[in-house]
């Protein structure tokens, strides 16, 4: 049976009652408005109350209405799965459906319960219904084509318009499921949209009550792709990489917002300091193994060196952090220097105490006993630093007094001043055979005043068989007259101590060389005055002519200064142009060499 035909039958039956009155004194019916016509002046299509009361004797019209209601109920049962109001049984007379359009005009139903059943059975053509009590009557009805806003405005209940629409939609789907019928695809599309987008306008009637984005429990911050990186990099599309666990971004975009000027972990000093003790401990462990193979011996030595260096670094850091330890170190250094000065003064006093001895006993050096074998271990031989010129002025004066005093008077033999002499070419030529002779030979340097001189150009006087003694020169005297060379090194075990306390007697007589001021053997006071005056020659710019014109003793007229920087290696020698005061013999001995030196200075 066609649904439209059934509705038409119901309308015809209701309208064919001859304007039947409603039995039992109750008003039920309402005339249906005729839609699709725009005649506003047509008054017969409007709602109006029934004009006549039902007459009790008109039984034939009531029987016809009951028959029509039975036919409509059969039609409704057939179309029940497709009607929203089919869940309402005909016996529940309190539900009146806003229904369908029809060409029939208004009607008045009669016969009480039959008309109510027919009207209830005819419901379901409209997806919106209202539950009203049975005593109510005279409700106006609108068709499907009427405005939805008007219908929603008349809703009075606990639901909002959007919730009511959603409820009707779910109830319709339930009817299809209850009738074992396939649910149309058009009913499922809005539900799918609601799962993906909470702002789907297809099933929002009115959002005036503010339900908005909270529909169905979805909020605007919900991520449609939870496992994907949310970084867009200022573009339209999101990053295609998967996000890190419990993070919003991938590994590439995790550190994108950090500052660029942060240093790397490898460059920080804290990590290097932490790694240093571990490396030192590993090296020390490898070095302290008792049975280390020979292949790993180099690693053990390196480990010991690293451990020693680390210990020095720790000590330096502790000393730097503790100012008291720094002060203590300075005190120790000062005490050490003072002890060296005391030892030097002691050695000088010993030299002064034996100054009455014969010079021959003081210098028992022969051709075989070369003093350079004893004291040539210092690599700075023949060189004088500026601080050595200024150091120990009193000791230099005492040394001069020693050599210019009675020792010079007692020495009768005179030795002419000749070229410089060289030390033995090989260690075997010396009488003192030291265990480390080769090492000493490697540390020697040639005799030089201001320019290097070849050893072949030196004098052959040391190798000459005529001379029994070594020729004395200022460079030799400045080197060999140490406490060891003066006979105090009887025990060879004391050589190292003597070298540590070495204070050369004439270390200040190197730069000037022999200047040619010769003294007589019996004029000791004049020699001292000559020394005090010749000390000022250093301030005269090493001018040889101006220094010797003003000789305090008046024994020298003019002394020529030898070629010191000659490349031929010839030693500066004295021109025998000096005139002596009461002596005819020229003495080029020890005294004439020692006292004439402009580099000694009194403070």
Swiss-Prot record:
Domain WRC: 223-267
Domain QLQ residues, every copy: 158-193
Biased composition (Low complexity): 561-571
Biological process terms in GO annotation: developmental process; DNA-templated transcription; regulation of DNA-templated transcription
Pfam (any one): QLQ
Region span, Disordered: 34-58, 561-582
Keyword annotations from UniProtKB, A to Z: Activator, Nucleus, Transcription, Transcription regulation
Intracellular or extracellular location(s): Nucleus
GO terms for MF: ATP binding
Any one annotated GO CC term: nucleus
Family: Belongs to the GRF family.
PANTHER family: GROWTH-REGULATING FACTOR 2 (PTHR31602:SF42), GROWTH-REGULATING FACTOR 5 (PTHR31602)
Role of this protein: Transcription activator that plays a regulatory role in gibberellin-induced stem elongation.
Entry's free-text remark on domains: The QLQ domain and WRC domain may be involved in protein-protein interaction and DNA-binding, respectively.
Protein name listed in UniProt: Growth-regulating factor 6
Lineage, opening ranks: Eukaryota, Viridiplantae, Streptophyta, Embryophyta, Tracheophyta
